[in-house]
UniProtKB/Swiss-Prot annotation:
A Pfam family recorded for this sequence: Ribosomal_L17
Keyword terms, alphabetized: Ribonucleoprotein, Ribosomal protein
Annotated InterPro entries: Ribosomal_bL17, Ribosomal_bL17_CS, Ribosomal_bL17_sf
Gene of this entry: rplQ
Source organism (scientific name): Geotalea daltonii (strain DSM 22248 / JCM 15807 / FRC-32)
Name this protein carries in UniProt: Large ribosomal subunit protein bL17
Residue segments, region Disordered: 141-181
Subunit structure: Part of the 50S ribosomal subunit. Contacts protein L32.
Length: 181
């Protein structure tokens, strides 16, 4: 019976599961973002957040505890010097899981687990207002009549404005070609 044993077993023995999580948390803290299955990402999240909390403590005992779980000394140093200070004012929730879809080979649900960046905010999308189609034929005729009576810009009038815009903007393809030469 598995009473009072929290956590998913993931079809592995205890030693294999612990070794897998040690490898995953080391890789996660090194790269700050990894792709894995949903179940592994959910299990990794709690361990990674505990490691970051240890990093926020910053004392020698916390460093030794983190080093006993994380396999690489450079990653432990990175945790205590760069990652943990980023979240000094945050009380938890250092990671986010983004679902990607399914893996083609075995239909396993994939996710990306990454560290939350406080400074980066998603840009707000501009809403485009589309022209509504006229509901009746009478409205369509009225709309076409107003369009015909409006002054029409000639090609010569629009050309200087387009040239002014093009002169200030660099084509990214030109930069790539220059680098290739």
């Amino acid at each position: 019976m598995r009473h009072n044993n929290a956590g998913k077993r993931l079809g592995r023995t205890t030693s294999h599961r612990i070794a897998m999580y040690r490898n995953m948390v080391t890789s996660f803290l090194n790269h700050e973002r990894i792709t894995t299955t949903d179940a592994k990402a959910k299990g990794l999240r709690s361990i990674a957040e505990k490691m970051i909390t240890l990093g926020k403590k910053g004392d020698l005992n916390a460093m030794r505890q983190a080093a006993s779980f994380i396999r690489d000394k450079k990653v432990v140093t990175k945790l205590f010097t760069t990652i943990a200070p980023r979240y000094a004012e945050r009380a938890g929730g250092y990671t986010r899981i983004i679902k990607l879809g399914i893996r083609p080979g075995d239909n396993a649900p994939l996710s990306v687990i990454e560290l939350v960046e406080e400074t980066i905010q998603a840009p707000k999308a501009k809403k485009k207002i589309a022209a509504k189609k006229p509901a009746t034929k009478v409205a369509a005729k009225a709309a076409s009549a107003t369009a015909e009576s409006a002054p029409v810009a000639t090609a010569n009038d629009a050309a200087p404005a387009e040239e002014a815009e093009v002169q200030g903007v660099k084509d990214p393809a030109e930069d790539c070609e220059a680098k290739a030469d």
